[in-house]
């Protein structure tokens, strides 16, 4: 059974149709890469999945649960949307860490805010805090940052900041982890360390959706690739099909820019 089902998503900004009848599915443990030129709708699609934008049409299901139906006003209530965001974790290309918190504090923050809504929070405050701190330290250690957890973002390299952002997204145990061009703000040396972390998550069967311009990485790490053009999914399939035997001329044109430099 698919962990994610997206059906006929449309999104318009003003008179510009940014997403046009987007449909795809993803199995648990799979990695999906979204590729395509800048402005093709990839980031908007991620933002719709994370409920940072509201689709004008379409349906989104996670674990066979209806999260969003544009025809059903109940699924568009802000109180419901806040809960549904927890199904997804989003790692931004520009990190978006809070500068006033350490690496550890950034990873703990969302989980602590969520814990305050628990009915037993006041009675178990110290215990809950200790549990959240231990999990945050484990995640930072997994990211290779155990010696940097008390550093502030301005004391970290771009690659380290991005790894903190990944740990922060993982802290809420999302069903699906999303990346929006996670290496676009990094130099080539730091790009490699972040891609290594993402590859490690893939090896652990973490379900992920990755917007990327790193074609070699997408080919290597993905179970499925979607090529988007002008707001539409023009081609989708296993990486060996999309990269080696694309059916659409537009896909071939796009990929030739990378293979030919």
Give the label of every model feature segment.
Residues 152-156, 160:
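Conserved ABC ATPase signature
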Residues 171-175:
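A short, proline-enriched helix->beta-strand linker immediately N-terminal to the Walker B motif
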Residues 177-180:
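Catalytic Walker B motif of ABC-type/P-loop ATPase nucleotide-binding domains
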Residues 188-190:
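Helix N-cap at the start of a conserved alpha-helix in ABC-type nucleotide-binding domains
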Residues 236-237:
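ABC ATPase "signature
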């Amino acid at each position: 059974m698919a962990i994610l089902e997206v059906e006929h998503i449309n999104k318009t900004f003003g008179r510009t149709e940014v997403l046009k009848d987007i449909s795809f599915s993803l199995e648990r443990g799979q990695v999906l890469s979204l590729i395509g030129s800048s402005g093709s709708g990839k980031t908007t699609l991620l933002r719709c999945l994370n409920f940072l934008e509201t689709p004008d049409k379409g349906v989104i299901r996670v674990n066979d649960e209806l999260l969003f139906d544009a025809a059903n006003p109940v699924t568009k209530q802000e109180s419901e949307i806040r809960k549904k965001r927890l199904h997804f974790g989003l790692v931004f290309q520009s990190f978006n860490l809070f500068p006033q918190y350490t690496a550890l504090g950034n990873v703990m923050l969302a989980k602590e805010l969520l814990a305050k809504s628990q009915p037993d929070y006041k009675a178990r405050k110290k215990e809950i805090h200790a549990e959240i701190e231990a999990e945050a330290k484990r995640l930072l250690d997994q990211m290779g940052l155990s010696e940097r957890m008390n550093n502030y973002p301005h004391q970290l390299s771009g690659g380290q900041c991005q790894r903190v952002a990944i740990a922060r997204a993982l802290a809420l145990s999302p069903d699906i982890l999303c990346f929006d061009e996670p290496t676009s703000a990094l130099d080539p040396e730091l790009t490699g360390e972040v891609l290594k972390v993402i590859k490690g998550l893939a090896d652990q069967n973490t379900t992920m959706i990755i917007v990327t311009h790193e074609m070699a990485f997408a080919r290597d790490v993905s179970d499925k690739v979607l090529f988007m053009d002008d707001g539409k999914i023009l081609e989708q399939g296993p990486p060996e099909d999309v990269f080696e035997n694309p059916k659409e001329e537009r896909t071939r044109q796009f990929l030739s820019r990378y293979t030919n430099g």
